[in-house]
Amino acid sequence: MTLKIGTRGSKLATTQAGTIRDQLKYFGRDAELHIVTTPGDVNMSPVERIGVGVFTQALRDVLHAGECDVAVHSMKDLPTAADPRFHLVVPTRADSREALIARDGLTLAELPEGAKVGTSAPRRISQLKAIRPDLEILPLRGNIDTRMGKVTSGELDAVMLAYAGLTRVGMQDRATEVFDADIIMPAPAQGALAIECRADDTETVRALNMLMHADTFVSAVAERTVLNRLEAGCTAPVAAHATLDGYSGDTMTLTAGVYALDGSDQLVFSAEGDGARPEELGELVAQQLIDAGAANLLGDRS
């Protein structure tokens, strides 16, 4: 049986899903893409206005209805609460860092005063304003080509995108600066894909399990536990970044931050823990943020 892989129709989404299709074929399972239009692809309002899960719910509905066998999501877009209807697999993560695409090859520090920078993500807005309060931050939606086209056309001086997305579509050379997590921290699970099938589809569960990457899975779980514990959605100004000890992978370091949208304040905490117990580490760092007053920064975005 040929597996139908549900995916959004953008260039990035189909490239991501195509990678999963090719991996399944490598392991002997024939697969093809099944394009699904989601409300988030039609409504160009800022994501925080449309609602959490806008990109994932339509795919999950199609999957649950049996119209496809597999759904491919960007893991950072998934609601943090587990859905027992589905089996989740997380393949190897791409580079999780944030990237700037600016005119004339400029870096963030080199952008002129009052430069226009496009992004709609509160997490990016708040961190950009903390570094460069003079910048004019403008809302930005659309696919990668549309976003970068606003720089090419001169409408914007720069845009902020996930470096993973640029890399997946072969446009990483367009980045004029890539930020380490201690400069601009990425979203929880940024760069990771979430692959779902119906939990009772045992044959497809077995096929997808061959794609699981344990280090990516536990890192994403730790990061998303922070989001869940803070009761914050994927559009909240919350960032997290987990790393595993390069030698043994036994020790995980998790850093997470909560930011005031105007860039005036931030809370950032780190802790080390057992890499095999990512939820506990996520709970620990989240509690540090809560005790320090994270709710005051999140406000009604929690």
From Swiss-Prot:
Q: What class of enzyme is it?
A: transferase
Task: Establish whether keyword Transferase is in the entry.
Answer: yes
Q: Which residues carry this modification: S-(dipyrrolylmethanemethyl)cysteine?
A: C234
Cofactor binding note from Swiss-Prot or TrEMBL:
Binds 1 dipyrromethane group covalently.
Offer one example of a GO biological process linked to this entry.
protoporphyrinogen IX biosynthetic process
Question: Which residue spans traverse the membrane?
Answer: none
Give the reactions, separated by semicolons, that this protein catalyses.
Answer: 4 porphobilinogen + H2O = hydroxymethylbilane + 4 NH4(+)
Q: Which Pfam families match?
A: Porphobil_deam (PF01379), Porphobil_deamC (PF03900)
Gene3D superfamilies listed in its UniProt record: Periplasmic binding protein-like II, Porphobilinogen deaminase, C-terminal domain
User: What do the Gene Ontology cellular component annotations say?
Assistant: cytoplasm
Its needed co-factors are: dipyrromethane
Keywords annotated in UniProt: Porphyrin biosynthesis, Transferase
Might you give the EC number(s) for this enzyme? Answer: 2.5.1.61
Give the metabolic or biological pathway: Porphyrin-containing compound metabolism; protoporphyrin-IX biosynthesis; coproporphyrinogen-III from 5-aminolevulinate: step 2/4
The superkingdom listed in its UniProt entry is: Bacteria
GO MF, one term, reads: hydroxymethylbilane synthase activity
- Please give the function described in this protein's UniProt entry: Tetrapolymerization of the monopyrrole PBG into the hydroxymethylbilane pre-uroporphyrinogen in several discrete steps.
State the family it belongs to. Belongs to the HMBS family.
On subunit structure and binding partners, the annotation says: Monomer.
Other comment: The porphobilinogen subunits are added to the dipyrromethane group.
Q: Which HAMAP family match?
A: Porphobil_deam
The name of this protein is: Porphobilinogen deaminase
- Name the species this protein comes from: Corynebacterium glutamicum (strain R)
